[in-house]
Amino acid sequence: MSFLLHQSRFFTTVNHLRDLPATSQPEICFAGRSNAGKSTAINILCNQKRLAFASKTPGRTQHINYFSVGKADEPTAHLVDLPGYGYAEVPGAAKAHWEALLSTYLQTRSQLRGMILMMDSRRPLTDLDRRMIEWFAPTGKPIHTLLTKCDKLTRQESVNALRATQKGLAEYRTAGYQGELTAQLFSALKRVGIDEAHELIESWLIPSDKGETDAAQ
C-alpha cells in the first residue's frame, strides 16, 4: 500500500516564532515526551530510517523541524516535529523558550490541522502530556494519541493502557473540549498500528470531500 507520508523530506528548522515558514499547506504536528519514541515513529510512518533525528541528549533539541510531504516542488502538506519535553536536565531558560515557542505555535498556527501526541504506553497521560492537551484545547482541533512501545507490554497490559488513556481523554470531552480526542496502540518495532495511524493522518491532510471530488474527475 502506498502512503502520501512516504513522500517526505526535510524542509526547514525553526528556532523562533518569527522563523515559521510562510506556507499555506496544512500541517500536522508531532509532540511527546523525550524518549517516548517520537523520532522513531515519524521515521517508520514516513518509511525512512533517518528523516527525524533523536538527540543524543534527550530534551536538548529545542527547535521545530519541518518535513514536506508530496512532490518536492509542490508539497501537499507539512509534518512538524516539535521538541521533546519533560527531561529534567534541560536548563530553565531552555524550558522557558520551549514553552513559549510551543504554546504559541499550537494556539495560533492556522495551518495546523491536528496533533499526534506520543505517549509511552507504560506511562500515559503524565502531567506534561496533559499540559500539551490543555495548550491545544482552545483550538478545537483533533488530537490523536499514539501509545508507543506497546511491544513492551503484554496483550492485557496494552488493553488496560489503551482503556486508561481513553478514559483520561474522555474527561476533557466532559469538561467541554470541542476537538476529537482519540488513541491507539503503536509499536515501531513490531509494526503495530502503523496503517491505522497512516489513514488517520492522511484523512486530516486530505479531507474526504477532496478525495471524492478527485475520484469523480
From Swiss-Prot:
Cofactor list: Mg(2+)
Residues the entry annotates as binding GTP: 32-39, 59-63, 81-84, 148-151, 185-188
Keyword Cell cycle attributed: yes
Binding site for Mg(2+): S39, T61
Keywords from the named record: Cell cycle, Cell division, GTP-binding, Magnesium, Metal-binding, Nucleotide-binding, Septation
GO cellular component terms, semicolon-separated: cytosol
Source species, domain of life: Bacteria
Any GO BP: division septum assembly
Domain EngB-type G: 24-207
The keyword Cell division is annotated on this UniProt entry: yes
Gene Ontology molecular function terms on file: GTP binding; metal ion binding
SUPFAM superfamilies: P-loop containing nucleoside triphosphate hydrolases (SSF52540)
Family assignment from sequence similarity: Belongs to the TRAFAC class TrmE-Era-EngA-EngB-Septin-like GTPase superfamily. EngB GTPase family.
Function in brief: Necessary for normal cell division and for the maintenance of normal septation.
Record protein name field: Probable GTP-binding protein EngB
Source organism per UniProt: Paraburkholderia phytofirmans (strain DSM 17436 / LMG 22146 / PsJN) (Burkholderia phytofirmans)
Gene: engB
